[in-house]
Structures are given as structure tokens and as C-alpha cells.
Swiss-Prot record:
Signal sequence, renumbered to the chain: 1-20
UniProt tissue specificity: Expressed in adult pancreas, small intestine, stomach, spinal cord and testis. Less pronounced expression in prostate, colon mucosal lining, and ovary.
Gene Ontology biological process terms from the UniProt entry: cell-cell signaling; immune response; inflammatory response; positive regulation of cytokine production involved in inflammatory response
Lineage: Eukaryota, Metazoa, Chordata, Craniata, Vertebrata
InterPro entries for the chain: Cystine-knot_cytokine (IPR029034), IL-17_chr (IPR020440), IL-17_fam (IPR010345)
Protein name: Interleukin-17B
Keywords recorded for this protein, A-Z: Cytokine, Disulfide bond, Glycoprotein, Secreted, Signal
Species this chain originates from: Homo sapiens
Entry's family note: Belongs to the IL-17 family.
Main location: secreted
Gene: IL17B
Amino acid sequence: MDWPHNLLFLLTISIFLGLGQPRSPKSKRKGQGRPGPLAPGPHQVPLDLVSRMKPYARMEEYERNIEEMVAQLRNSSELAQRKCEVNLQLWMSNKRSLSPWGYSINHDPSRIPVDLPEARCLCLGCVNPFTMQEDRSMVSVPVFSQVPVRRRLCPPPPRTGPCRQRAVMETIAVGCTCIF
């Protein structure tokens, strides 16, 4: 082999052998770079073991949190309030916003969880931060996010059989914002 082929061969071998080597961070920031995958240590559990321990633990916890939020919403006066006003004395961010929102309960019997808190804008316009009055030159619009739910899939009424469940993402209003 002549020298260009030898050089190409050596370059190929070095690249092939270097693929398994960890790379150093390329950023010039001081401190640590982006964290890599967790290596098991005396106080760390490998990520694959965490996911194998209880696959539905996170979803069950999520559904329990949603149920608690709905219960708190039902026990408060939040559902009755429909005023377009900002209350800076409250700690809740939805009432301190320039596009305040309240919550309603989105009920769907074929979904798990059956009830989801959903944001609804309290103003058509936005609250002017200087006058603290509604300004209709701007518009309050809902902000949407996708949340994981399970859908009950049951056979049509003439047929009988077990219902199945399917995990899906559903779009829900989670807050409001101001646009021009």
C-alpha cells in the first residue's frame, strides 16, 4: 500500500476506536459541562433500574395530584369568580397576571382522570399595569399544553366485553397570556 492509503487506513482505525470514548464539553463556560448519563455510585440508582421498578408509579402519582387539585378547586370559591381584576395581594399567579384566569372543571367520563382543571381567561382584554383597568386594545388568550390522560375504549352498546385503556395526550388550557 502506498502512503495515502496507509494514512486513510490509520485515520479510519483511529476514528473507529475513538467512537466509544467520552467527549469533553465543547463549551468555553467555566464549571462543569452538560451532565452525562448517571453512572451508578454508592448513592445513585441507574436510570434503567428506576424505570423498571414501578412503571406506573409516576402516572398514578400524577393522577392523584390532579384529583387533589380538582378537590381543592371544588372546595374553594374559585369556580364562582368571573371578575376581570388583578389582585396583587394574592399569592396565586393566575390572579396576579395582566391576563388573569380562573379555573373550571373539564369533565369527561371516558377519560382517566375524569376531571381536569382547565384555565379560562377572566378578561377579554388585558389589564393595563399602570391603571390596573382592563384595556381592550390587547387580547387575553388561553395558553394550551398537552397533558397525558388515559382513554377508556369500550365496545359499542349492543356488544359487551371488557373496556381497554389507551394513553393519549390531550390539549388543555393551562393559563392565559396577553397578545396585541
